[in-house]
């Protein structure tokens, strides 16, 4: 039996990001697999103090609970002794403070080191140093897309032999609204006779929210945009644009919402618009498809890998192309029907159980070295 330590710090985030969702779902799925490995869940105390909700996954059988234990980073003499664990898996693109016998890191995106100004200079400097060290030290590097793998090959010293691509999973909704219920829910949100364009993700420069707003300005008045997500880098300019252009009556800024409310918003939407300029995976694309919503996404970065033939793609730098495609999806009932059907089929190809099984194979591969 081997002991595998995982940096589970992001599982206790009160407003889970993509990394937090990945961390939670991977750990929960690992708990459901048959394996002799023991998993050590590790937390940075500064994060743990925020919330104590997710400390240990709920195992499917009592016998599995013994395979999970917890260490806080406040106990360096008991946690950081490298021989305590046979393998360390960083789920958050950063290395542990001390070296382990074997290390794996999952990398989602590397935009801070590609020259794009999608974050502050201070963040880019700190992130770049941590990422480069993590990749250099790792025995294997897991990415969620071929796009990120190719970026790592281009911008770091990682070799192709170290890379393993494991796409993320998606949960099918626990409750699905009937078409009439979806329409009523949409009318409650944006008014009778109006169409609801949903945008899910942090409101920031990288998510291309400004061009989504510019596209909205060229669409009929009855088209409304609902933004779901907290504020990020560049959000001030986005909020100022909404005020300056007088879009307050057509744009709802809902901030972060819990999972149950998010599913309801997906199922109320006419379309998901996801024109992100840089994306390592793009989980909202699959989430929308799983909830029976057609998707219009940027035809760049990893998004075509995720959406496949089930989504329609646009030039994210061209607001008119975005607007034309959104209107086509909303106005063409037969196209919508086909996209929803293809989207549901596409979403079923991705599961967290498959993510856990593929990750476990990487663990076994590294442990055998």
Model-derived features: positions:
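Carbohydrate transferase catalytic cores enriched for Leloir-type hexosyltransferases
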Residues: 1-369
């Amino acid at each position: 039996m081997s002991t595998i330590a995982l940096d589970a710090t992001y599982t206790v985030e009160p407003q889970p990001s993509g990394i937090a969702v990945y961390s939670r779902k991977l750990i929960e799925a690992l708990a459901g697999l048959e394996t002799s490995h023991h998993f050590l869940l590790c937390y940075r105390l500064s994060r743990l103090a925020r919330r104590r909700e997710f400390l240990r996954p709920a195992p499917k059988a009592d016998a599995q609970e013994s395979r999970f234990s917890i260490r806080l980073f406040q106990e360096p003499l008991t946690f950081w002794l490298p021989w305590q664990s046979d393998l360390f898996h960083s789920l958050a693109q950063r290395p542990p403070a001390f070296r382990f016998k074997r290390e794996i890191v999952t990398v989602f995106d590397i935009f801070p080191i590609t020259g794009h100004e999608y974050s502050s200079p201070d963040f880019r400097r700190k992130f770049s140093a941590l990422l480069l060290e993590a990749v250099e030290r790792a025995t294997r590097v897991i990415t969620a897309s071929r796009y990120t793998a190719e970026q790592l090959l281009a911008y770091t010293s990682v070799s192709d032999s170290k890379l393993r691509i494991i796409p993320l999973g998606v949960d099918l909704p626990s409750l699905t609204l009937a078409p009439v219920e979806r329409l009523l829910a949409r009318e409650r949100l944006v008014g009778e006779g109006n169409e609801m364009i949903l945008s899910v993700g942090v409101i920031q420069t990288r998510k291309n929210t400004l061009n989504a707003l510019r596209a909205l300005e060229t669409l009929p008045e009855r088209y409304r945009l609902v933004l779901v997500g907290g504020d990020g880098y560049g959000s001030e300019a986005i909020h100022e644009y909404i005020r300056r252009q007088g879009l307050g009556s057509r744009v709802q800024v809902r901030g972060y919402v819990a999972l149950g409310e998010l599913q309801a918003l997906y199922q109320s939407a006419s379309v998901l618009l996801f024109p992100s300029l840089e994306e390592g995976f793009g989980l909202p694309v699959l989430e929308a498809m799983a909830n029976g919503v057609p998707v219009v996404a940027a035809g760049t970065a990893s998004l075509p890998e995720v959406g496949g033939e089930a989504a329609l793609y646009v030039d994210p730098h061209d607001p008119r192309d975005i607007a034309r495609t959104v209107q086509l999806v909303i106005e063409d009932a037969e196209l919508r029907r086909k996209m929803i059907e293809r989207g549901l089929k596409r979403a079923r190809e991705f599961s967290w159980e498959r993510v856990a099984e593929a990750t476990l194979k990487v663990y076994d591969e590294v442990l055998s070295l």
